[in-house]
Amino acid sequence: MSNMIKHIDYFPAGYCSSHSGLLFKGIPNEKMQFPAGVFLIHHREKGYILYDTGYHYEIKKKARYFWYRLATPMQMKKEDQIDYLLQERGIDPASISYVILSHLHPDHLGGAALFPNAHFFVTQEVYEVYQKPKLKDLIF
């Protein structure tokens, strides 16, 4: 079973800035950067599996993300988007078989539309939280 995973790669697909006091209790309130990390798992039988998809570049333009951008300003170039990063490594985004989303914030699911051939997975808990989300669930 341990030989099922050929390798795991990490991609920084943009980052946001926020104050630690908004996100964590009991620590000094300092401005911090939070990378939108994406992991690519190369499974011997299942092919390529992504864990999260990072930001989508269009979040910088879409009005519906105004409050998110205000609370957690995001920085990225178009080339930081996960489809570009994969193509730089010679991996066709259409070859991604599965995407596991840790949760449904824009820095984790933003690039989901870039993988139309993939099967998507979330935990039951994530699914239930987003049936009736609170504002904090959508941002932090």
Model-derived regions: residue spans:
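Structural signal for conserved beta-strand scaffold positions within catalytic alpha/beta enzyme cores
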Residues: 10-12, 122
